[in-house]
């Protein structure tokens, strides 16, 4: 056991985690040069296309160190995006140490900080690594000072390497073996294995990634899931050397995969503890905090025949992604679907794309909303995650919206722009600290504003230099209203949105204008209105298509023309009574972009 090292690689987006993993795998000979490819751990097509890591991946490698000993390295490559931070905390729970990778050109960014604090809270040994020293813009001295100043860990002798060229990666491994402590645990004690992650394989059923904390797990053992008490047979187990390799047992301190022929998706939840049926452990290991979704949106299959497949797909995906929340929902405009909860907009986009790709579904998404706390006049408190569930205005005593605490790190040059943006988003500044030429800003901003497009706009006002980390702080009373959209005097539930009273006029007007562009013209006039309660705040009309009935009139008898026009008018009126308006998918997505173009 003293030769096992478990560690994660944590860093801000694009600081080179996945490339460093590639080099480590290459040096330790996990894959032959022929099998090696760039970002070998980003196995999902989506990850490669966007160049981001979404799922944490684990690998077990053997490394022969300079002291002649052979060490087992179990390492986990983690995502860097704020939306996937729960993946990072799950990976860290399985480790004793973490490599904090910092780009020697960019310096410390907000996610670097957030992930590093997560690691420190879990009492992990953090080893700083300065990456990308081959860049002409690299300034390792300055960045080492930044790490000490902002993060507060000693970085004077931080390892310098370039994952791209492979310089210094050997030193990283030596430092790892020296500084990160071996796992603790009792190899003879009763088995306790933490489920770090699981996913669904069509042939094997549920595959779980486990970290053995105490005891040993052997092939063929009867394993008990502690939360449900169900017993399964450990059919196969092994390790990843990126490839799945079968083993006969997993020893204390190791990280490996396990297949128990579990067909039920909820059979082995992530964060649960496995133990032996015949010699069970006294208590379960502390799991992970359940992450609360911040953004909710309705997902509906385009054709209602896909509903069953859609339900199964969501089940399989939620196994792989513990933070996805979903419950059935029906809408008059869109039929049956699910209300899903996500950690942020990127998460929502990724999930939608994974559903469409991996399970071949066509989906319609409604506008994302956050959760509001409503105190009714009967003094009940309810939580509302969709505009259609909001009680009538006269039953609401107080409506409270979620406030997020946002930590931003940015160069001083962009401070003015960013402050203007935060104020426009109804933010309140709570803190501001200067570190060298970087500024750390803390703002409290309503979650609804952060979730919509704050991140994109922050990046664009600061030319990509500002970075953001946010978390839910509290609910706060504020003047929010529901804007309904009426098409030909019928409310369309899927188009309603909740917004601040100050913006409601402009939001309503903009939404109506957007709709006017997107709804195709029909044989009759379509009235589009935005309303708060019964008060109409904006209206526009999609003009009808009409045939020129006077074209065949030759000469000028006015009564003949009037008769024809009158007849046409009556026809249109009848049509309007029975006509339905088809809404294209773009119309639902228009709400997402309301408030973006006007800036």
From Swiss-Prot:
<dbReference type="InterPro" id="IPR027417">
    <property type="entry name" value="P-loop_NTPase"/>
</dbReference>
<dbReference type="Pfam" id="PF03144">
    <property type="entry name" value="GTP_EFTU_D2"/>
</dbReference>
<comment type="function">
    <text>Required for accurate and efficient protein synthesis under certain stress conditions. May act as a fidelity factor of the translation reaction, by catalyzing a one-codon backward translocation of tRNAs on improperly translocated ribosomes. Back-translocation proceeds from a post-translocation (POST) complex to a pre-translocation (PRE) complex, thus giving elongation factor G a second chance to translocate the tRNAs correctly. Binds to ribosomes in a GTP-dependent manner.</text>
</comment>
<dbReference type="InterPro" id="IPR000795">
    <property type="entry name" value="T_Tr_GTP-bd_dom"/>
</dbReference>
<dbReference type="Pfam" id="PF06421">
    <property type="entry name" value="LepA_C"/>
</dbReference>
<dbReference type="InterPro" id="IPR000640">
    <property type="entry name" value="EFG_V-like"/>
</dbReference>
<dbReference type="InterPro" id="IPR035654">
    <property type="entry name" value="LepA_IV"/>
</dbReference>
<comment type="similarity">
    <text>Belongs to the TRAFAC class translation factor GTPase superfamily. Classic translation factor GTPase family. LepA subfamily.</text>
</comment>
<dbReference type="InterPro" id="IPR004161">
    <property type="entry name" value="EFTu-like_2"/>
</dbReference>
<dbReference type="InterPro" id="IPR006297">
    <property type="entry name" value="EF-4"/>
</dbReference>
<keyword id="KW-0648">Protein biosynthesis</keyword>
<dbReference type="InterPro" id="IPR013842">
    <property type="entry name" value="LepA_CTD"/>
</dbReference>
<keyword id="KW-0997">Cell inner membrane</keyword>
<dbReference type="GO" id="GO:0003924">
    <property type="term" value="F:GTPase activity"/>
</dbReference>
<dbReference type="Pfam" id="PF00679">
    <property type="entry name" value="EFG_C"/>
</dbReference>
<protein>
    <recommendedName>
        <fullName>Elongation factor 4</fullName>
        <ecNumber>3.6.5.n1</ecNumber>
    </recommendedName>
</protein>
<dbReference type="GO" id="GO:0005525">
    <property type="term" value="F:GTP binding"/>
</dbReference>
<dbReference type="Pfam" id="PF00009">
    <property type="entry name" value="GTP_EFTU"/>
</dbReference>
<dbReference type="GO" id="GO:0097216">
    <property type="term" value="F:guanosine tetraphosphate binding"/>
</dbReference>
<dbReference type="InterPro" id="IPR031157">
    <property type="entry name" value="G_TR_CS"/>
</dbReference>
<feature type="domain" description="tr-type G">
    <location>
        <begin position="2"/>
        <end position="184"/>
    </location>
</feature>
<dbReference type="InterPro" id="IPR035647">
    <property type="entry name" value="EFG_III/V"/>
</dbReference>
<feature type="binding site">
    <location>
        <begin position="131"/>
        <end position="134"/>
    </location>
    <ligand>
        <name>GTP</name>
    </ligand>
</feature>
<keyword id="KW-0378">Hydrolase</keyword>
<keyword id="KW-0472">Membrane</keyword>
<keyword id="KW-1003">Cell membrane</keyword>
<dbReference type="InterPro" id="IPR005225">
    <property type="entry name" value="Small_GTP-bd"/>
</dbReference>
<dbReference type="GO" id="GO:0043022">
    <property type="term" value="F:ribosome binding"/>
</dbReference>
<feature type="binding site">
    <location>
        <begin position="14"/>
        <end position="19"/>
    </location>
    <ligand>
        <name>GTP</name>
    </ligand>
</feature>
<dbReference type="GO" id="GO:0005886">
    <property type="term" value="C:plasma membrane"/>
</dbReference>
<dbReference type="GO" id="GO:0045727">
    <property type="term" value="P:positive regulation of translation"/>
</dbReference>
<dbReference type="GO" id="GO:0003746">
    <property type="term" value="F:translation elongation factor activity"/>
</dbReference>
<keyword id="KW-0342">GTP-binding</keyword>
<keyword id="KW-0547">Nucleotide-binding</keyword>
<dbReference type="InterPro" id="IPR038363">
    <property type="entry name" value="LepA_C_sf"/>
</dbReference>
């Amino acid at each position: 056991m003293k030769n096992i090292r478990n560690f994660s690689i944590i860093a801000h987006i694009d600081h080179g985690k996945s490339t460093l993993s590639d080099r480590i795998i290459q040096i330790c000979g996990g894959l032959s040069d022929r099998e090696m490819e760039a970002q070998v751990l980003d196995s999902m097509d989506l990850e490669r296309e966007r160049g981001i890591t979404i799922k944490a991946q684990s690998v077990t490698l053997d490394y022969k160190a300079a002291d002649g000993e052979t060490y087992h390295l179990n390492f986990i490559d983690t995502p860097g995006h704020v939306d996937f931070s729960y993946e990072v905390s799950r990976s860290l729970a399985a480790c004793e140490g973490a490599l904090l990778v910092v780009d020697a050109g960019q310096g410390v960014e907000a996610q670097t900080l957030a992930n590093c604090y997560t690691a420190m809270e879990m009492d992990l040994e953090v080893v700083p690594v300065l990456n990308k020293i081959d860049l002409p813009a690299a300034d390792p001295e300055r960045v080492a000072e930044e790490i000490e100043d902002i993060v507060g860990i000693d970085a004077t002798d931080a390892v310098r390497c370039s994952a791209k060229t492979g310089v210094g990666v050997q030193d990283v491994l030596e430092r790892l073996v020296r500084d990160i402590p071996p796992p603790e645990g009792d190899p003879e004690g009763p088995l306790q294995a933490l489920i770090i992650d699981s996913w669904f394989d069509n042939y094997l059923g549920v595959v779980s990634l486990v970290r053995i904390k105490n005891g040993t797990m052997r092939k063929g053992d009867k394993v008990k899931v502690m939360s449900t008490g169900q017993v399964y047979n450990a059919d196969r187990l092994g390790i990843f050397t990126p490839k799945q390799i079968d083993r006969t047992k997993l020893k204390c301190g190791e990280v490996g995969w396990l297949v128990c022929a579990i067909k039920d998706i909820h059979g082995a939840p992530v964060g649960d503890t496995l133990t032996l049926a015949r010699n069970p452990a006294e208590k379960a290991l502390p799991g992970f905090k359940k992450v609360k979704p911040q953004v909710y949106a309705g997902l509906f299959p385009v054709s209602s025949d896909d509903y069953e497949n859609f339900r199964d797909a969501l089940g399989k995906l939620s196994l792989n992604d513990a933070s996805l929340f979903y419950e059935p929902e029906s809408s008059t405009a869109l039929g049956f679907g699910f209300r899903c909860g996500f950690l942020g907009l990127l998460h929502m986009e990724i999930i939608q794309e994974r559903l469409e790709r991996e399970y071949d579904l066509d989906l319609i998404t409604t506008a994302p909303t956050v959760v509001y706390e409503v105190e009714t006049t009967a003094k009940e408190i309810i939580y509302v995650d969709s505009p259609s569930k909001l009680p009538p205005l006269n039953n609401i005593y107080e409506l409270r919206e979620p406030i997020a605490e946002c930590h931003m790190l940015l160069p001083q040059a962009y401070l003015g722009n960013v402050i203007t943006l935060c104020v426009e988003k109804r933010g309140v500044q709570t803190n501001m600290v200067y570190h060298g030429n970087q500024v750390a800003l803390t703002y409290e901003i309503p979650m609804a504003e952060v979730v919509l497009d704050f991140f994109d706009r922050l990046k664009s006002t600061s030319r990509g230099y500002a970075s953001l980390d946010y978390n839910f702080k509290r609910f706060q009373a504020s003047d929010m209203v529901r804007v309904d959209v009426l098409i030909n005097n019928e409310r369309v539930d899927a188009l309603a949105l909740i917004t601040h009273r100050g913006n409601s006029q402009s939001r309503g007007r903009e939404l109506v204008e957007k709709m006017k562009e997107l709804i195709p013209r029909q044989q009759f006039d379509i009235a589009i209105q935005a309303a708060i309660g019964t008060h109409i705040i904006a209206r526009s009309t999609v003009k009808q298509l009409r045939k020129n009935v006077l074209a065949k009139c030759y000469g000028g008898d006015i009564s003949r023309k009037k008769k024809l026009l009158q007849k046409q008018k009556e026809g249109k009126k009848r049509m309007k009574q029975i006509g339905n308006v088809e809404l294209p998918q773009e119309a639902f997505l228009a709400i997402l972009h309301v408030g973006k173009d006007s800036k």
